[in-house]
């Protein structure tokens, strides 16, 4: 079935910044998607087109991206009469219209909005849930479907928070749960225990939450943060059932070839900055002491040597985000250099659904894991919840069990699990190889 209308408008994300919403209309109705945006963005990412007019929205307007959908993409899609179910053809047409390697002409935010809305329209035409349509597009096995382990960002540092803590995200992963719904209950209980402990130790205001719903107390070191989380896990009664994951976002504190764990202090002492090897030693100590199962972006996005050296004997999942930015060329290099063994999949880093699916497949082919991810500037759109089930990746990170833009995805996964019943299993401790379950 052909598309009868494509329309974009500017709406707001969870940080109050403008973002692009796209509606695609077919005979079956109108289908809508909203594009997220990140705070710590990799230099190799597809371009999110912002207006740059400082007199409106502090330069963050998306009126150009919206116009690109309404004035360029919409007429081209309608005149090409592309079948809404032919995702590859839709995406290829937009990439040709754009013609740049990083989508800088039309904007990844314009292209992705259309790409996701088209997938929703196609699922409706096929009369199947979105996750089933995405599984069809990816060629994923659906016997059984796999529900992901939620990696819940319960404590924030780095660029997402004040305080001196350099590492950006401390996540809990309820790998010992029997189902997704049990995992979310466990995660929620630990989160509440963590908030109480944080207020007791750091004062009432320390319980306030950051962009992704995690607490952001004035913590100085990773050990202090991890001790607090371990205490919360114990208080909730889930020791041994809940693991921990880190997103270090190290590109944010990489300076002159060294890592500055005091990067938020303008007078930071450069004699205390760490080499890649010294930072690797710090991670190894943390892995030995705490139940850490996954480390994302342990080193800067172009510090390939440090990545490859660390991966050899890390013993935990090493997730590439800024290193690969969901970009097929960067993923191929990371695979060849043996720099990591999991991809963080953010659809807006590459900017189209077809390319996102290909990135996941390339990763699976190299026996990598894939973790589907939200962005810090999120919306009520639940697309990635269906995507993680459709791609069968077994792991998702979408913030804390707090703030509606985070819960939207987690609640959608609860619905999917309920709908699938015995046709689905929970990834649990096998999250890294969920595509093979």
Swiss-Prot record:
Q: Residues of the signal sequence? A: none
Cofactor binding description: Mg(2+) is required for catalysis and for stabilizing the dimer.
This protein's GO CC annotations: phosphopyruvate hydratase complex
In which residues is Mg(2+) bound? 247, 296, 321
What Gene Ontology molecular function terms does this protein carry? Answer: magnesium ion binding; phosphopyruvate hydratase activity
User: What superkingdom does the record give?
Assistant: Eukaryota
GO biological process, alphabetically ordered: glycolytic process
Which key words tag this protein in UniProt? Cytoplasm, Glycolysis, Lyase, Magnesium, Metal-binding
Q: Which coenzymes or cofactors are required? A: Mg(2+)
Pfam families, from UniProt?
Enolase_C, Enolase_N
InterPro entries in the record: Enolase, Enolase-like_C_sf, Enolase-like_N, Enolase_C, Enolase_CS, Enolase_N
Assembly, per entry: Homodimer.
- Protein name from the UniProt record: Enolase
Q: Which gene encodes it?
A: ENO
